[in-house]
Swiss-Prot record:
Residues in the signal sequence: 1-18
Protein name: DOMON domain-containing protein Y73F4A.2
Alphabetized UniProt keyword annotations: Glycoprotein, Secreted, Signal
InterPro entries, per database record: DOMON_domain (IPR005018)
Organism whose genome encodes this protein: Caenorhabditis elegans
Region (Disordered): 148-168
């Protein structure tokens, strides 16, 4: 427990020491800032179980948005990029295609707290879209992972209109 608090505190301090934006809800705590043509983000889901997925999507069309998705399996977190719809499971970007990659600084899962935390750097030109302009960000609570396959998410993603350039 102390270890999880120490890691989360260090991550929060790193983001809090710069000008940041924040989204906070009952299930999420997300911090981000725009720098060097990237969005530096700490994404934390505070109610996710093993064998579930979560993520953040970008785009005004709820039936077609790109995103960064986090899978918790065997108490380990992996990250992938792709696209999805309001309730559908993500379709992942194929490796080797001409898409911008997400850089991962930290991935942590604390099963006793059901908390997943990730620190990622997302390029402003992401999967064929520009994240520079104001648009809706969609925070996907969770979906199940069954036999290695992601299922649809149970709840509609929470939305927030974000203008990442105005946070710096």
């Amino acid at each position: 427990m102390f270890r999880s608090i120490a890691v989360l505190s260090a991550l929060l301090f790193a983001f809090a020491s710069a000008k940041t934006c924040k989204y906070d809800s009952s299930d999420f705590e997300v911090y981000w800032r725009f720098a060097n043509n990237s969005i530096n983000m700490q994404f934390m889901n505070t109610d996710i179980k093993n064998n579930e997925w979560t993520g953040v999507g970008f785009g005004d069309d709820k039936n077609n948005f790109v995103g960064v998705f986090f899978m918790v399996s065997n108490n380990q977190v992996t990250v992938r990029t792709g696209s999805t719809t309001q309730h559908g499971p993500p379709t992942f970007t194929q490796s080797g295609t001409n898409t911008a990659s997400v850089s991962t600084q930290a991935l942590n899962y604390f099963p006793e707290d059901k908390t997943m935390s990730a620190v990622v750097q997302i390029p402003i030109q992401f999967n064929g879209r520009s994240l520079q302009s104001c648009q809706k960000w969609r925070f996907v609570k969770s979906g199940k992972i069954e036999n290695g396959q992601l299922t649809r998410n149970d709840k509609s993603p929470k939305e927030k209109k974000v203008c990442p350039m105005e946070c710096n």
